[in-house]
Amino acid sequence: STHTAYATETFLDVLATEAKQDPVAWRLKMLDKHPRHAAVLALVADKAGWSKPLAKGKKGERRGRGVALHESFGTVVAQVAEVTVARDGSFHVDRVVAAVDCGVAINPDNVRAQVEGSVGFALSAALHGEITLKDGVVEQGNFGEYAPIRIQEMPKVEVHIVASANKPSGIGEPAVPPLAPAVANALAAATGRRAWRLPLQTEQFKA
């Protein structure tokens, strides 16, 4: 699901760019027969201020905003990521806005906590989750070589739950798949460069 989401949501952004279409509007056009997905996407766009200009960074910095939408475990999640990219290609994910339709949210605080945790987990994979082999053996043996994100890498996360009367659906993992494509799409918006492999590397985005 995570790999599928990255492939489909980054490619949709490529198509939107080639068609000179807004990425959110482009997706909404294709969701006319999927009102649940459209509602989640519209909510995240509204809460993220998608239609408003993104605040400029410091001199030499490039900023971008990206979106992704995905369904897994019966739950629909849309995310908007905002990034700041330095001249040397290093970048920071500043903010992630998420909208989630998981049916009836029996415990809204738990839903928010799960989404926040999923963003952290997914960002770790997107930035640091590379597995390499040497002589048929995985080289990463501990957290020193396979690092989770540090607290300074964690973005501000906002979670918005769609009011629903439908039966509850999964919330443990559905916010993981859209994160990497949302960040990659934001980086493309900021730099004009597409990341065709994960994890996302500084070298890909140098000015």
Predicted regions mapped to residue ranges:
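Cofactor-binding beta-sheet edge motifs in enzyme active sites
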Residues: 1-207
